[in-house]
């Protein structure tokens, strides 16, 4: 009995380590925006089978992309305080195990999307995987301080994937959702990079605060926040959304702008940390308001 219990605990621990490779908190936001994209794509209810299979498929491929990131950056992760507890730096899983895991999970996700959703969603998701795992992680991130701006395109794709899963096409409204996340990505990550600047410098990662300094980065956090605010007003301007969304977006935008102005004028690491955390709530809140407005329109 005791032997069985120990074996079960060891198995559960191993499963947990592989689960951590998928960066579940990051993937949960990806899946959330993808699901919102599904609901926004139709006036009524999303077919249950499409909702389930698309969600699972997108989550699997996103998790595989996160595992690629962990695999490629394991030496960097071992140095940085924020990431040294991940499974690969700790040695709780090996590189070959990670590769097999991500291949199986990613392959399963693509198969689900192709066979049970539609080929367009599968190809768009594969393109997103390549954009994040290869173009961003392997090429852009260690090469240019504009990694977040250029690589942000892959991170902005989830609502487009959700939209395509339900409709089989990509519309202008879907691309507007893409633009929101694309504009959100730089101020979100640069807030993190500001208070983690020394760690990024230590591992030679050319994040904007490392290459161009704090003041330049703080200015760009503010500028990109203003761009983000302009983009978030577009769903109302194009009549994609109504007054509920407009009111919610304005409230969320004002708070984000407050953080951006404070970061520019009176910077502290704690302020940047708070701004980074708020930016996650901001994006989730913005898409939640989009969903509410979609079904309750004024």
UniProtKB/Swiss-Prot annotation:
It is found in: Cell inner membrane. GO terms for molecular function: protoheme IX farnesyltransferase activity. Keywords: Cell inner membrane, Cell membrane, Heme biosynthesis, Membrane, Transferase, Transmembrane, Transmembrane helix. This is Protoheme IX farnesyltransferase. It comes from Nitrosospira multiformis (strain ATCC 25196 / NCIMB 11849 / C 71). One of its GO terms (cellular component) is plasma membrane. It is an enzyme of class 2 (transferase). The keyword Membrane applies. HAMAP family: CyoE_CtaB (MF_00154). The gene is ctaB. The lineage of its organism: Bacteria, Pseudomonadati, Pseudomonadota, Betaproteobacteria, Nitrosomonadales. Pfam families: UbiA (PF01040). Pathway: Porphyrin-containing compound metabolism; heme O biosynthesis; heme O from protoheme: step 1/1. Its EC number is 2.5.1.141.
